[in-house]
Amino acid sequence: MASNSWTANSSPGEAREDGSEGLDKGLDNDAEGVWSPDIEQSFQEALAIYPPCGRRKIILSDEGKMYGRNELIARYIKLRTGKTRTRKQVSSHIQVLARKKVREYQVGIKAMNLDQVSKDKALQSMASMSSAQIVSASVLQNKFSPPSPLPQAVFSSSSRFWSSPPLLGQQPGPSQDIKPFAQPAYPIQPPLPPALNSYESLAPLPPAAASATASAPAWQDRTIASSRLRLLEYSAFMEVQRDPDTYSKHLFVHIGQTNPAFSDPPLEAVDVRQIYDKFPEKKGGLKELYEKGPPNAFFLVKFWADLNSTIQEGPGAFYGVSSQYSSADSMTISVSTKVCSFGKQVVEKVETEYARLENGRFVYRIHRSPMCEYMINFIHKLKHLPEKYMMNSVLENFTILQVVTSRDSQETLLVIAFVFEVSTSEHGAQHHVYKLVKD
């Protein structure tokens, strides 16, 4: 395998540390409200029970009366502890906690290896949230497991793909948009399917089988595969050598080999125009690539990345990416990987891989390709943010675009857009695949 090193569009270290002092003003002089542990526990429970509702009232079905959220929280504290907190005290406590979360978020964003524009946008995103939303988002992240990565059957074409999910118990309104992923109030994580070590050949099917399956193999429209190339496996990982014969490995993200059946549903579709702004718009960007085609070569992968590594990092830790592809034809492929922040390319790596004939199919393996320094630093900074919702806020504007082409013909073989959130599941890294369409 021949590979080029990572190349940067601009130095990640050029970001300034100023530009957000206006958000800091007025925060540091506020006294931090401290409640006794029993009251604080009841307060946190109530936050999870009663979602933020603005100036609207909540009707209790057993009483038929309307209450403001803070009043309900105060009632809950009284019932649980026998101690009184007024709705004004609840409101003040929420504001104090929100300011604390904002400070933590600002410190985390400033520590990230991002340019100033990216930092400002991230801070503006936080500034658009109310105190109740900030505090409740933190509570829900801690209380409930992440959403099961199952697709919604329908989502509005006008909704923004990247907005935050509705809070517990809320229906999305004009200012609350929907992701194309289910957001159950009490998500239940389904068991993961067993890993399969085999996969179907990309060789043409016999005439009888072809007619029985409409001339298409089962993996067509059910996996990341165009008519020319199929992704078999993809992983990003950290590896630490314990001794000469022992390695410890942690997977940040992983797509394993699968062997779909005709009974499996085809991939759901996402309109490619919803994510144009998350990837470069210049020459070679997602929009230009899609217009060039072929349309069956474009896919979106949503990763829930596992950052909860139990491996102790050391100076010899290796960060890498491995991928594997298969084709019915012998080709030399070129794999371009672009790391993007706020739709702008930060670094790019281009690798060349040659075909190896295995069991009647041509296989391409990129094994242990080193991660760029930008990505390694990004992971380190991300892991040090104190809250999962802060990590996800940063990841909303972080994407990766992989483009696989034929080196000789320059034909586009496969385009994969990667987007990310943080997994809190005991199952570790998870993913869901969509095909990109343009209706």
Swiss-Prot record:
Region (Disordered): 1-34
Residue stretches of biased makeup (Polar residues): 1-12
KW Transcription regulation (keyword) present: yes
Residues bearing the modification Phosphoserine: S148
GO function terms (MF aspect): DNA binding; DNA-binding transcription factor activity
Keywords: Acetylation, DNA-binding, Nucleus, Phosphoprotein, Transcription, Transcription regulation
GO BP: any one term: hippo signaling
Location(s), subcellular: Nucleus
DNA-binding region ranges: 28-104
Disulfides per UniProt: none
Listed Basic and acidic residues bias regions: 14-28
Subunit structure: Interacts with YAP1 and WWTR1/TAZ.
Identification of the protein by name: Transcriptional enhancer factor TEF-5
